[in-house]
Amino acid sequence: MPPPAHRRRRTAVTVATAAALALGAGALTLPGPGDGATATAAPVSSASSDAPSGARLAERLDRGVVSVGGPDGNLVTWRLLGGDDPATAFNVYRDGELLTPEPLTGATNHLDPDAPADASYTVAAVVGGQEQPPSAPSLTFADGSLDVPLDRPEGGSVNGSAYTYDANDASVGDLDGDGRYEIVLKWDPTNARDNSQSGHTGPVLVDAYTLDGTRLWRIDLGANIRAGAHYTQFQVYDYDGDGSAEVAMKTADGTRDGEGTVIGDAGADHRNSGGYVLSGPEYLTVFEGATGRALDTADYAPGRGNVADWGDGYGNRVDRFLAGTAYLDGENPSMVFSRGYYTRAVIAAWDFRDGELTRRWVFDSDDPGNGAYAGQGFHSLSVADADGDGRDEVMFGAAAVDDDGTGLWVTGHGHGDALHVGDFVPDRPGLEVYGVGENTASPDAWLADAATGDVLWTLGSGNDNGRGVAGDVWAGSPGAEFWSSSVSGLRGADGDEVGPKPGSANFLVWWDGDASRELLDGTRIDEYDPDGSTRLLDGEGVASNNGTKATPALSGDILGDWREEVVWRTADNTALRIYSTPHETDLRVPTLVHDTQYRVALAWQNTAYNQPPHPSFALGDTAAEGAGAPWPDIRHP
């Protein structure tokens, strides 16, 4: 049976249609906020049903207006919201002066030539010929970037090992319900360790900042949470539907919340002589986004049990954690935390409702009938409505777990690093999963049907293939392209070689004005071309994270129009520097964060070996066909 199409409850709206309807009465109105618009939603319920009956809960965001200075003037960009009337047009104002003789009905950007770099802009939606209240003033990227000042923690020493702090992975969420994103940032001590390495580490700290650099709170995870890429995976999302995001992560005895309250036993130290934490209680805590206050704490599932049951006896594989956010009931977000992937793998899903954590289900590869799922996890995970039933699945490397916590499929290709899930082959129904493997007895790279796990093609064998990317980086080949470290060439949707391999296999970013994605690696952005890539951005005074992984603190559509921002730490760790595109576009696309597959990808991006986000639709091919992006079906708190 062919897999079902996945574009459920979405409406494609062309730019031409939007332009035709923008100024007339009787335009189709979808519930949504916008600036000056209203929307309501039923409160979150934990009740389940056979099929989702309503729209997905999504953030009520403002326009996110930015002004990016460049040699040709200021590029003003803003969000087209998923709750907007698709025909919404916009007026643009500079310091209160109207710049647009007629409301703009196309892409949500406007170039203001020869304007002062510090000019302030607002935009006002026009719906049915009526101008709505103006947006909040623009954020100014005078030289192409915006610095968010940081309060760098003091370093210290532990067991003879001195350390300072580097700003590491980040996430975003509307922590206070004002429609604007705040940043949640993890600070790693410089003596952080891979699980395979012994040694004591300094404590992991987690901060929250407004975009003007105001620190809202600091959480100290304490001595019993080791520092390293595989230990702390934090999720930032509005789980209870109150309009403000929560922050969830693994905690332990001695964790101190944002108000100074200690979780568990403040004096306990469970570290052994090698710095590993292989005894003592383990917790999952949900913190209030606005204050960092611990709202509820539960025992982490699963517990470590017998350390050797996870693949070794010294503490490496037992502490391999992943985390994500998924709409398991099709309407409301749940959190997912896991343990293990080399051998035993356990995934626990949780709801946070009415101030309490409730375990939704646990999937354990040790349970009867689940043995094939052992050893299939990657150093990352993804979340998508893989089978088209309106509810999300957990894409766990070379396997998938259904929304109800039962196994959906397993390829048997084993453990790997990079995992990508999206609509990579638009001429076939549904989503695809691209993986690259470390298992030398399995294919180096493979593409599978996300609904069934049926493998569409494989490439190479016998190698530990550490890097791989899937994305539409070249318009000369239909659908996405695929490449990886140990496989030659750039591969097309059918696996055949279509061009030379790009110079990096890391992150992706929509940066210039077309629908193809650019290459993001280290502190630079390049545009792929078979005849040679073109450098579009060199980040100045910034540094990437996670050693040779060379990842940004965060990358995604967090401000302005649908193009993606890149957030790097400054080299001296005094600020996060946000870059936003200076390039115009003629593509009208709703903000990607109102596509829930993309939005939850921003939530899990910080997990272990960070990977770029993918939406649920093929942006490049819909643009090439002259169609607008599919319109989200969402509701707001």
What are these regions (language model features)?
Residues 89-92, 576:
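Short beta-strand elements bearing conserved aromatic residues within extracellular beta-rich modules
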Residues 9-12, 65, 96:
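Small/flexible residues
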